[in-house]
Amino acid sequence: MSSELSGKVAVITGGSRGIGRAVALKFADEGARVAVVAAHDRDALRQIEEEIAVLGGDSIAMLADVSRRGDVEGVVQSVLTQWGRIDVLVNNAGILRLGSLESISEERWEETLAVHLKGTFHCTQAVIPIMKQQRKGKIINIAAPSALRGSFGVADYAAAKGGIIAFTKNAASELSAYNIQVNCISPVADTRMTEELTKFRREALGIARREREFVAPEVIAPAFLFFATADSDLVSGQMIEVGRV
């Protein structure tokens, strides 16, 4: 275990698998105390707690739906009770529903924006008073390539991610006076979501194979570490793409 985040407390939503899991393990290995949040899969949460313990780290795992303000407030209160502060927030929770623009129902549209965009809003708003009081904080949001270039079958997902990019820039501007940096990562990695998207495009468009190979989530975790540490103290309101080759 190294010490890039020694003494820091990080909250990571969508942390039970994929990118969130890789980031949680990376932060724990760098000395952070990590709160891992997921909407489902208590077994996966228990597993990541065990893995962090093997690293010599400290963690708590919680089930919560970030689209519900009450759930988010409960997470924040639990973290404060446990550790008394929150230094880093990673807004990674997300869902993916696939289908053409014409087929998207109002229910699907609202659910996707609720988890991605409203969830990012809820979590960010909940930690602002804490970070203001600390006069320091790091917030890392998640975009997607589809928000930048367009993609078949994910119009609602892309719209939510585009909103997160705009939200990131506005939050960064508003919170800069309190030494709170807000940045955004657009990751491409080998996760369950990319597998589902690849399969959908193959069936819908006749694409026989992946357009590219994807890196493992662990490969892009250092980008999150950069935005979580003092190395990025002079960087805010930025969006970077990671894992796209």
Outline where the language-model segments fall.
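Conserved glycine-rich cofactor-binding loop
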Residues: 9, 16-17
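Conserved glycine-rich Rossmann-like NAD(P)H-binding loop of the short-chain dehydrogenase/reductase
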Residues: 32-47
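Substrate-binding pocket helix/loop in short-chain dehydrogenase/reductase
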Residues: 100-101, 108-113
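Active-site helix of classical SDR
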Residues: 124, 160, 168
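Alpha-helical segment proximal to the catalytic Tyr-Lys
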Residues: 129, 173-177, 191, 233
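Residue(s) in the substrate-gating loop at a strand-loop-helix junction
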Residues: 144
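C-terminal helical subdomain
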Residues: 184, 205-245
